[in-house]
Every structure is written in structure tokens, then in C-alpha cells.
A protein has these predicted regions:
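A glycine- and charged-residue-rich anion-binding loop/surface
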Residues: 1-202
Length: 202
């Protein structure tokens, strides 16, 4: 059974009741963000009905869409059918989200600084390793001029408290209606979360 990604529809949700579906450290609904999309996994814990905690060391999503919560051993009270409260470490979640949003802001700044033809090749939002790598398609002559223009654009966006919008697309038609895609771009699973400037990218 595919795990429902509760954090996609309600990113502010930091806890939810979950039912253990197998003694393999996975449940049927995940508020924890799994490692992926250039962002580290959430940290958190399962709270048992009697108030005891089981720390979650890692969160992994497998190829079948099942989210696995990796824990250090299982409590005897954790069994198939048991109900636990899955809780996310708030400071860690928001720090990782801020780093991810910063990467999105850099991509928007590149676009608005006049480099809309650049494409993102990869992005990493891990603490201490944050970066967005672009392909300029061989058009850049002076990197210092480009870096200055992008930095200036980013500063303006921050000073103006640049608004963003968050949307979800359930299929390719819906995605193309709200977002310009690169040729050949594809997604392994749906829904796709879109983060863009409030007025969109042309």
C-alpha cells in the first residue's frame, strides 16, 4: 500500500495519527518528509499511547511509494495494527524547508535576472552543502557579471518580500497548464509540488 504523503497537502502538519501496517518500521501515512528532491529527511519520533517515544533515525521512500521510518529497535507494544502518533522535529523541518526555499529563490532570481534560458541540472539543500547547478547552454561570457546580476536580483527579491505560490499538479496536462516545462522533462510520481513566484514564470 502506497504511503499518503501528508506533508505535500499540508506542509504545516507536524504530527498525525498513523497505523502500523507491518513490523518493518513503516506506517500508512507520513507527515515526515522522506529524503529526496535534494532535501534531507525529517527527524522525529513515534509517540505511543502511554506517552513513550521511539526515535525515528531516518525516513526513506522506496520505489513503490512506501515511506519507511527507520528506528532503533521496536517496542513490544508496536505491532501490526497499533496506532502511534507520528511527530516531526519542528526546528529541523523548518530549517530544511528554508534551505529548500532558498534554492527555489535562487532559481527564480536567475530567471528574473535575464537568464530564463538556463536550466537547473541539479540542486542540493542539505545543510553545509547547499547549491543549485545550472546549464547555461554555452551562452555565458563573463561569470562575474552574471553572478553580480543574480545576486542583485536575489537581494531585491528578499528586500521586497517576494511572494511565492505553492501548487500541486495531479497529471501532466495540469502541470503544463501552470508551469513551463523543459523538453523531455518527466516525473516518476504524482502529485508534483510546484513552487514559483506568485505571478508565475513566463
Amino acid at each position: 500500500m502506497k504511503t499518503e504523503m501528508l506533508y505535500l497537502s499540508a506542509p504545516e502538519l507536524l504530527h498525525a495519527e498513523a497505523r502500523i501496517v507491518a513490523i518493518s518500521d513503516r506506517d500508512d501515512g507520513a507527515v515526515a518528509v522522506a529524503k529526496g528532491g535534494g532535501q534531507p529527511a525529517d527527524s522525529g519520533w513515534f509517540e505511543l499511547p502511554d506517552g513513550r517515544h521511539i526515535d525515528v533515525r531516518n525516513v526513506i521512500r522506496d520505489g513503490e511509494g512506501i515511506v519507511w521510518h527507520v528506528v532503533d529497535g521496536l517496542d513490544p507494544d508496536v505491532h501490526v495494527g497499533a496506532i502511534v502518533e507520528a511527530k516531526v522535529n519542528r526546528p529541523s523541518r523548518y530549517y530544511n524547508s528554508q534551505l529548500h526555499s532558498a534554492g527555489e529563490a535562487v532559481a527564480a532570481a536567475v530567471h528574473f535576472a535575464g537568464y530564463a534560458h538556463w536550466s537547473v541540472q541539479t540542486a542540493c539543500h542539505f545543510p553545509g552543502q547547499c547549491r543549485v547547478v545550472f546549464n547555461d547552454h554555452g551562452t555565458t561570457k563573463d561569470l562575474e557579471v552574471v553572478a553580480t546580476a543574480i545576486a542583485r536580483q536575489l537581494e531585491e527579491m528578499v528586500q521586497d518580500d517576494f511572494p511565492i505560490r505553492l501548487a500541486y499538479a495531479e497529471d501532466l496536462d495540469e502541470l503544463n497548464a501552470v508551469h513551463r516545462l523543459e523538453e523531455g522533462k518527466h516525473f516518476a510520481e504524482w502529485p508534483v509540488r510546484l513552487v514559483s513566484p506568485k505571478d508565475g514564470l513566463s
